[in-house]
Amino acid sequence: MERQVAAEAQEKFRLCRCPPDFYVMNKLLRREMLLRLGLRFRERVCYEDVEYTMRLLGEGGVLVTVPDVVYRYVVNGASITKSRQTPKKQQDKYLAHKAFVAYADARGIRLDARFRRITRRSFGRWGLTWLKIKEFGDRETYRLFDLIPVWRKRVTDKQACDGH
């Protein structure tokens, strides 16, 4: 990657490949900017990096990319993100991605349709996903093996907030 400068939110999201990559560990940040934006990671929430990164790119000022590797990091195999999915982790991920879509819409950031299909819940056993519930706008689709749509229904904002 060559050195690039971007000030527009749409271009910053594109350069950072966000979505789907909401990584915070591949960005160097100025302390003053973090203080100005009041950015903090929320505690006891998984996928908090989605909220953090969307605000960072959407409100953080100019983005400069650099062509060189600046630092390296190691992925912890025992980390929360590498551990087994739980209903709480799935709910946190759903809420984070739903908030991102709302944030993008409020700021006029164009999203590919595939990033508007949000997985609400997955059910699986033995490494096989047998049912996945996906939301797209005001519709929920239940998909067998994440391939075959078997049920669709319209959802209200209250149902989406309650997780039903």
Residues covered by each model-derived region:
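C-terminal subregions of glycosyltransferases and related glycan-biosynthesis enzymes
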Residues: 23, 72-164
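Generic macromolecular interface patches on structured domains
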Residues: 63-66, 110
